[in-house]
Structures are given as structure tokens and as C-alpha cells.
A protein has these predicted regions:
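Glycoside hydrolase catalytic-domain context in secreted enzymes
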Residues: 1-254
Length: 254
């Protein structure tokens, strides 16, 4: 139980575009510039995951929230964004995600709460399959924002119940469900009803297990170089000072 509580899957960086200063989570982002956001995100992902030539990853970084998620918070569970122009989508909201997938090999992508063109992002085949996997070549893990699958039937009303939501999320490409409701617990029922095949479910389980193998969770800790870093180094004063100094130097006036 102690080991299970120490997750090596970190849900950062937030590469959403900060367009409205009233958005209360804007401080998590890298601003309103898609190029700057892309470059900062690439550096963060590479630093968190470690060198690609290593057998094991330090952590699994996560590009979030995919996509077109920039507040406000109060309407994120019900919003339907159906007026996003193709130019805004491809030149403003998607470049950072594409960069993290293709230039940083980010291991996780988190789908957002709201709907985009009538489909919830975590059940949006165009976003998760056609763009993310088919066009960009992403082959790793998609995780839902916490409670996003439950939103399918509680607030978006795009699903009739938890069983339908579980099938919709899985078939669209969301591998792991976070949060409350846990619709994916209904997948065995969905399989028994013939709504989804066990082979389809296995495909998503395999992606999850591949991530855990990449972290070395299935091997002896002595084989994983990152386990040799002492806790005295983690969050130490030298690293805090470096982070503070970097933050001071990177402030940008647009």
C-alpha cells in the first residue's frame, strides 16, 4: 500500500493557452503564446521523463488538458465548444500538444472535461484517434481528467448511463479513467452485453501496463537508476533556488 501511494505518473505540464486572465488556473500554464508554450513543455517533459536512451523513465509526464481547455472553471463540465475556427484550433490550441508528442515523446495525454463540437473530449474520436494517434503518431496512454467520464451521463447527457459512458470513452481512446463515478468498472458488464469486446479492453490495459514496465515497477528497484537518488536530493534547497531563479529570468511581457 505504501508503494502504491507514491505515484510516478505526474499530471504535468499544463500546455493550455492562457487567453483570459480571469481563468483561475492560468498560473499553471506558460502563457498565451503557442510557440513558447510548446518549447517550455518540451523541456519539462524531457526533464521529467529522463533521457530516451535510458531503459527506464524517471516519471511519466502528461500533456494536459487536451484540447481547447482554457477556462472558465465553472462551466467546464457542461460547456460545448462548437464555434472554434479551424485556424484557432490548429494554430493556437493544438501546436503544444503536437510538439510534446512528436518532439518530447510525452508518455501521457489527459483529455479535457468539456465538449468539442458536441462530443466530450474524453469521448471524442476525432481528437483522440484521428488527430492524436493517427496523424501525430501517439502510442502511449490517454487518461481522463478526474470525473470526465462520469460527466458523459451526469452533465453532458451524451450517454444514458455509466455502461454507455464506459464504452464511449474506451472506444474513443481514453485508456484510464480518473476520478469519481468510475464508469470503467462497468466494462465487464459492457463486454457481457456485447457492447465492446474483451480484445478492445485488453488493448487499453496493455498501454497502462507498458507504462508501468517503463517505470521499472515490475523489476527489482536495484535495476532502476532513478531509485538510487536519495530523498535528500528531492526538493532540496539547491533545486528550489534554481527553480526560483529560472522563474525570475523567464518572465515575458507580450
Amino acid at each position: 500500500e505504501t508503494v502504491r501511494s507514491h505515484s510516478l505518473s505526474v499530471w504535468t505540464p499544463n500546455v493550455n493557452i492562457f487567453r483570459d486572465p480571469r481563468w483561475g488556473r492560468g498560473q499553471e500554464t506558460y502563457g498565451e503564446d503557442p510557440y513558447l508554450t510548446s518549447q517550455m513543455g518540451i523541456a519539462v517533459v524531457k526533464g521529467l521523463q529522463g533521457p530516451e536512451h535510458e531503459k527506464y523513465r524517471k516519471l511519466l509526464a502528461c500533456a494536459k488538458h487536451y484540447a481547447v481547455h482554457s477556462g472558465p472553471e465553472w462551466s467546464r463540465h457542461t460547456a460545448n465548444l462548437n464555434n472554434v475556427s479551424p485556424r484557432d484550433l490548429w494554430e493556437t490550441y493544438l501546436p503544444a500538444f503536437k510538439a510534446l508528442v512528436q518532439k518530447a515523446d510525452v508518455r501521457e495525454v489527459m483529455c479535457a472535461y468539456q465538449r468539442l463540437d458536441d462530443d466530450p473530449c474524453c469521448g471524442n474520436t476525432r481528437l483522440l484517434q484521428q488527430i492524436l494517434r493517427d496523424e501525430w503518431g501517439f502510442k502511449y496512454l490517454v487518461v481522463s481528467d478526474c470525473g470526465a467520464i462520469a460527466d458523459f451521463w451526469t452533465s453532458h447527457k451524451s450517454s444514458s448511463d455509466a455502461v454507455h459512458a464506459a464504452v464511449k470513452g474506451t472506444m474513443a481512446g481514453t485508456d484510464v479513467e480518473c476520478g469519481y463515478g468510475y464508469a470503467y468498472q462497468k466494462l465487464p458488464e459492457a463486454v457481457s452485453k456485447g457492447l465492446i469486446t474483451e480484445e478492445e479492453v485488453d488493448k487499453h490495459v496493455l498501454r497502462l501496463m507498458e507504462g508501468r514496465f517503463e517505470l521499472g515497477e515490475m523489476d527489482d528497484p536495484s535495476l532502476v537508476n532513478w531509485t538510487k537518488i536519495p530523498m535528500s536530493v528531492v526538493n532540496c534547497k539547491a533545486h528550489k533556488d534554481l527553480s526560483l531563479n529560472m522563474s525570475r529570468q523567464t518572465m515575458t511581457l507580450l
